[in-house]
């Protein structure tokens, strides 16, 4: 027994397996590992993929999108988002151009970026399908609905 610790007093859970946070930690770590192995073959990190897919989604109808909108949807702080976009730009996958107001920069995919996303998105979705294959369709739908409740408002709109 660890000296000075009494888990019956400091935790509401009898075992770690009853802790949603503990379970989420293990699930997310395992899931990320599976996704990262797929993306590595395409030369992308997981954050780069998230931003690339976000740019692709937000510009799919020809709309202009700035870094603020990308960061909001991707759940990234402005500095991290900017660094990831800079890395995508250096790889030739995205480009930034000044917006009409001059303060923000619009981001779009290059032809190479679109090509990579056309490979990466189906590969990630296949990895997702494989990872979640222990769940039947009803369980997967319920899990997705539950996750949607936990995502901060405005992120996936």
Walk through the language-model features, giving the residues of each:
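C-terminal regulatory/oligomerization modules of transcriptional regulators
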Residues: 1-13, 62, 138-157
